């Protein structure tokens, strides 16, 4: 990731500020400088906040980032543009705030844009999803960003001096090692679950074993005394237990079957005795009922006599009823004959009236026939009258259109001849255009190669000149450096140390006298005068310091120039001069112009020919269409003439309107005549049919009357014969018998009921006598007592058998469950043994006492330390190396870092380093960390790094080494920014981002030294 542009509104001390990082050329090293509290670190906070919604340091909350001088109605926002993998993105984040005058908080906003074809297109517009998009895009979260891109103030050396637990938190975030801890927890939970399941199975086995029924049997009790943990012994005892249970069940079953047989015998005897007793009682009752039934015999015989008489008189009664019906029919037939005769007379009168109307209508028949003839002949004309009328209307228009179409057709034919003359023998040549295009492309390629080579040669000359200038500067500075070193060597440094002893010598002089023994050398003091020129010594010391400072500055300049020469050499190696044509640029441009002119001429000719061909095709099509229209016009004109001739010939009319009026009038007259004729014919037909019907009815009624008279005569003869047979003299005898008919159904029912009951009792007495014959009735009370005794014994044994059978089956089920649990338990212990061992190993129960996560983190830390030591060796002049403390214990350990001093060949605690040495180690470790994370993550693009403070603890030489390290980072293509108050850095680093504050707000600007 490489910053391009940063815009801050109401953020920290910046009310409205923009920083254009594109002014930093070639990823050069730059310094961020300013007074304390001016807002230098806020620049890093702004970049981190724009991307992740957090500050660059964990101590700063989001609310602390808003400017105290911001307008209460304006939000805090940051807009950050950056480049990642050759693609440009922009993020805009607005912080939440309570707008002045409101009580509710305005929510945060976050938008992510990507530049596509020179314009920004939105990718995300929500805070949570947008932040997640940035994390996935960069490949790091906020904590990783602080470790890789921004080394914040106060946290620069945190990773170096942190203990194992703190390092674990940092490394866990950077290398996503929580998944290994998650694996450990998963395995731990799995083992816990498996152990719980195993324990549960032991409990289930024990519970089932305790629930097995012993039947108070000593053998079973002995088998059940085995402890449930002895699962192998349980397996041995289970078959024995099941066999003994079956023996007990068989014994109980035998007793039960004997009791059932004894009960069935007494039950059968009791049932038979009860049936015999019931049959005897029923027999006695039926005999009494039979005697009572016989007493009703005389009454039943009287009823049967009446019913016989009623049956015999039935025929006579039927004849009497039939006589009445026949007499009624004769009267009705006479009435029908009279009515029918009257209807026939009325129909004859109606027919005479209609015949008169028909005669009057036939007198107009000739006139109607002539009209029908006209209608038949002209019906086809009238049905298509619109066709003939349209012909009269269109004939003149078609004559005019035909003449006009003929003129237009002649004009088009003349135009076609003109176009064909223009085309002549010319043809389009597109192959020539392709050939010319290829030639022009080749010439352009040759011209571009020549121009690129000229540009590359100019760039090469410029770079060679820059390189020569830098080498000259290095030679000049090397010469000056040698002179300064020679000048420095001329000073006698051994006498310069007395300058610091001036006050000490004065104290000794004040304490001794001439002739005393010197407390330093032991000689006698001869003189107390001034033998040392301390002013001269101080002057020489200042001269030496000035020379050393100049030497140091020249060395720094030489190092910078060497880095710049290295960068120039890389550019020179990237310059590629291609093989070019032997022709000059002028000749190629001339050939290009000639071919372009030829191409344009051929294109114009092709275009002209295509236009003429298109015009020819267009004219041909128009001529064809005109000819079709002319043919159609002539056809339509002929059709109109034929239709008019046809109309006038058939109708004898030359006016459509007159024809239509007369035709419709004739049709109306004919229709009226035909309707009236049809109506009269229909009436005559109806009258004829009605008269025929009535005549048939009259014949029918007369035949019926004759039949009824004959039936009446025969019926009277039958009545006389029946009365004679029954010895009846008059109608009174008949009436008396008829009176009995109301009681006939009741009498029949009474008779039938008596006979049915008589037969049933007779049959039942015979059945019961056969069932009780030769059988003795036993004492019911004795049988009942014996029955209850046998039944109680049987039920007791059945219940006992059911209980024993259930308990045996239950024992079998439980022993089967126990066997199933034991088999599953054995298999489970076998299957889970590897998981138990793996869980112990990843939890730290191994020869190194390390958890899986700590083992992985130690691996990454070793990689980081190895990478860091490459730079620390250079910065410490091969004195210090970082090492990981090997002493480990169970849990979080093994991540502490010590320093190994190659001078003493011993390792010591990191806190024993000086401030400058700690900075060197922290910087080397931080750079090593970022590089290892980039190697492991793959997708992270580290194109920039920013360092906040830490350089103030370095001496001049160490500062030079640190700067060389950062310059090497810059030469690898990474933008490096530093925040520092060290004045030496302002002189050494040419590009400075100044942050100025007026106690109200801050502003920034880039300047070059």
UniProtKB/Swiss-Prot annotation:
SbcCD cleaves DNA hairpin structures. These structures can inhibit DNA replication and are intermediates in certain DNA recombination reactions. The complex acts as a 3'->5' double strand exonuclease that can open hairpins. It also has a 5' single-strand endonuclease activity. GO terms for molecular function: ATP binding; ATP hydrolysis activity; endonuclease activity; exonuclease activity. Gene3D superfamilies: Helix hairpin bin, P-loop containing nucleotide triphosphate hydrolases. Belongs to the SMC family. SbcC subfamily. Residues 176-364, 392-502, 535-802 form a coiled coil. SUPFAM superfamilies: P-loop containing nucleoside triphosphate hydrolases (SSF52540), Rad50 coiled-coil Zn hook (SSF75712). Keywords: ATP-binding, Coiled coil, DNA recombination, DNA replication, Endonuclease, Exonuclease, Hydrolase, Nuclease, Nucleotide-binding. ATP binds at residues 34-41. This is Nuclease SbcCD subunit C. Heterodimer of SbcC and SbcD. InterPro entries: P-loop_NTPase, Rad50/SbcC_AAA, SbcCD_Nuclease_C. Pfam families: AAA_23, SbcC_Walker_B. It comes from the Bacteria. One of its GO terms (biological process) is DNA replication.
């Amino acid at each position: 990731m490489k910053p391009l542009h940063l815009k801050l509104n109401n953020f920290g001390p910046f009310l409205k500020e923009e920083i254009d990082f594109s002014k930093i050329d070639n990823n050069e090293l730059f310094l961020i400088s300013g007074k304390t509290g001016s807002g230098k670190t806020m620049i890093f906070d702004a970049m981190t906040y724009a991307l992740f919604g957090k500050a660059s340091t964990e101590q700063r909350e989001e609310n602390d980032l808003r400017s105290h001088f911001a307008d209460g109605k304006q939000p805090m926002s940051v807009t950050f543009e950056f480049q990642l993998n050759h693609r440009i993105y922009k993020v805009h984040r607005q912080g939440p705030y309570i707008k002045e005058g409101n009580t509710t908080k305005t929510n945060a906003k976050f938008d992510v844009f990507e530049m596509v074809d020179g314009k920004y297109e939105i990718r995300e517009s929500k805070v949570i999803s947008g932040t997640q998009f940035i994390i996935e895009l960069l490949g790091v979260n906020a904590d990783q960003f602080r470790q890789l891109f921004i080394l914040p103030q106060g946290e620069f050396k945190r990773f170096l001096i942190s203990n194992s637990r703190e390092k674990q938190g940092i490394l866990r975030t950077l290398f996503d090692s929580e998944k290994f801890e998650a694996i450990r927890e998963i395995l731990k939970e799995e083992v816990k679950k498996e152990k719980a399941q195993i324990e549960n199975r032991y409990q289930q086995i024990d519970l089932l074993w305790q629930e097995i029924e012993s039947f108070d049997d000593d053998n079973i009790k002995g088998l059940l005394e085995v402890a449930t943990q002895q699962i192998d012994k349980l397996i041995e005892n289970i078959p024995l237990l099941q066999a003994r249970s079956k023996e007990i069940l068989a014994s109980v079953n035998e007793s039960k079957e004997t009791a059932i047989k004894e009960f069935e015998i007494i039950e059968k005897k009791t049932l038979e005795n009860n049936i015999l007793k019931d049959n005897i009682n029923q027999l006695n009752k039926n005999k009494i009922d039979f005697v009572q039934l016989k007493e009703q015999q005389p009454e039943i015989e009287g009823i049967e006599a009446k019913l016989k008489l009623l049956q015999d008189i039935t025929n006579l009664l039927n004849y009497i009823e039939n006589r009445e019906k026949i007499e009624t029919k004769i009267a009705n037939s006479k009435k029908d004959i009279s009515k029918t005769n009257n209807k026939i007379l009325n129909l004859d009168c109606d027919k005479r009236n209609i015949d008169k109307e028909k005669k009057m209508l036939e007198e107009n028949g000739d006139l109607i026939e002539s009209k029908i003839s006209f209608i038949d002949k002209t019906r086809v004309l009238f049905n298509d009258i619109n066709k003939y009328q349209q012909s009269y209307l269109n004939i003149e228009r078609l004559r005019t259109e035909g003449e006009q179409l003929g003129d237009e057709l002649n004009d088009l034919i003349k135009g076609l001849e003109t176009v064909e003359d223009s085309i002549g023998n010319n043809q389009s040549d597109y192959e020539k255009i392709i050939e010319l295009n290829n030639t022009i492309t080749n010439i352009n390629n040759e011209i571009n190669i020549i121009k690129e080579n000229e540009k590359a040669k100019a760039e090469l000359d410029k770079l060679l000149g820059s390189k020569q200038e830098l080498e000259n500067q290095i030679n000049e500075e090397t010469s000056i450096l040698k002179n300064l070193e020679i000048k420095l060597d001329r000073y006698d440094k051994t006498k310069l140390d007395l300058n610091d002893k001036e006050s000490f010598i004065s104290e000794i002089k004040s304490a001794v006298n001439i002739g005393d023994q010197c407390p330093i050398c032991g000689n006698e003091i001869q003189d107390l005068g001034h033998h040392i020129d301390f002013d001269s010594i101080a002057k020489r010391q200042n001269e030496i310091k000035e020379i050393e400072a100049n030497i140091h500055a020249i060395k720094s300049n030489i190092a910078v120039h060497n880095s710049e020469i290295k960068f120039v050499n890389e550019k020179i190696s990237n310059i590629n001069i291609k093989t070019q044509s032997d022709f000059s640029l002028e000749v190629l441009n001339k050939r290009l112009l000639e071919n372009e002119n030829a191409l344009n001429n051929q294109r114009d000719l092709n275009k002209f020919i295509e236009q003429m061909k298109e015009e020819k095709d267009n004219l041909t099509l128009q001529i064809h269409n005109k000819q079709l229209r002319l043919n159609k016009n002539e056809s339509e004109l002929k059709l109109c003439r034929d239709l008019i001739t046809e109309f006038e010939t058939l109708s004898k009319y030359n006016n459509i309107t007159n024809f239509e009026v007369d035709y419709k009038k004739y049709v109306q007259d004919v229709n009226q005549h035909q309707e009236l004729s049809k109506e009269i014919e229909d009436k005559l037909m109806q009258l004829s049919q009605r008269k025929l019907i009535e005549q048939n009815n009259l014949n029918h009624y007369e035949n019926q009357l004759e039949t009824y008279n004959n039936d009446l005569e025969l019926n009277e003869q039958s009545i006389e014969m029946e009365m004679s047979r029954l010895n009846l003299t008059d109608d009174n005898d008949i009436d008396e018998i008829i009176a009995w008919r109301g009681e006939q159904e009741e009498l029949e029912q009474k008779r039938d009921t008596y006979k049915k009951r008589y037969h049933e009792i007779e049959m039942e007495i015979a059945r019961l006598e056969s069932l009780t014959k030769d059988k003795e009735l036993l004492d019911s009370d004795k049988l009942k007592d014996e029955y209850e005794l046998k039944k109680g014994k049987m039920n007791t044994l059945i219940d006992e058998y059911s209980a024993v059978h259930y308990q045996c089956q239950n024992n079998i089920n439980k022993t089967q469950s126990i066997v199933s649990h034991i088999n599953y338990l054995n298999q489970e212990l076998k299957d889970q043994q590897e998981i138990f061992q793996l869980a112990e190993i990843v939890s730290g129960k191994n020869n190194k006492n390390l958890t899986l996560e700590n083992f992985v983190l130690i691996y990454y830390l070793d990689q980081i330390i190895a990478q860091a030591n490459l730079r620390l060796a250079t910065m410490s002049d091969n004195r210090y190396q970082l090492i990981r403390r090997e002493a480990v214990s169970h849990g979080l350990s093994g991540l502490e870092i010590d320093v190994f001093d190659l001078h003493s060949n011993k390792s010591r605690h990191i806190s024993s380093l000086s401030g400058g040495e700690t900075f060197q180690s922290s910087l080397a470790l931080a750079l090593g960390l970022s590089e290892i994370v980039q190697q492991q993550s793959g997708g992270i693009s580290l194109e920039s790094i920013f360092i906040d403070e830490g350089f103030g603890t370095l001496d001049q030489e160490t500062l030079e080494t640190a700067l060389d390290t950062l310059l090497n980072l810059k030469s690898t293509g990474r933008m490096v920014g530093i925040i520092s108050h060290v004045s030496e850095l302002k002189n050494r680093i040419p590009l400075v981002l100044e942050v100025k504050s007026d106690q109200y707000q801050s502003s920034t600007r880039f300047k070059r030294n």
